[in-house]
Amino acid sequence: MARLALDADVVIAFLDAADDQHERAVSALRPRLTAGEEIVLSASVYAEVMVRPIARRTDAKIDEFLDAINATVIAIDRPTARLAAELRGRHRSLRLPDALSLATAIAADADLLTLDTRLDRIQEHEKETP
């Protein structure tokens, strides 16, 4: 079974019909869910996704969604953190949250689903580079 790591922007836009990227997130994620791909996300993505809902006291909606799609939150261990640092070293424009998201996907042998075209290009570059 294929593994799919979610970036924060996908989860946020998927769940917010008013988000400018909602339709894009739905069209990108729904077929992958239908295909039964195993869904993972880094602990840092989970934290990022929860900030606004916790403030608004709507955080249960996020947990219900993640439970419904059987998403696994993956802790960031030392090797993954080091990989994130290496990614930042190779790609100077990469922000730490994005580096952690991509590093978690790589460590989990998963494709990272993101709406960030820059991050997607970096992911493709990393796949092509041995």
List the predicted regions and their residue ranges.
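PIN-domain endoribonuclease scaffold, especially VapC-family toxins
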Residues: A2-R3, A17, E23-H91, A103-L113, ...
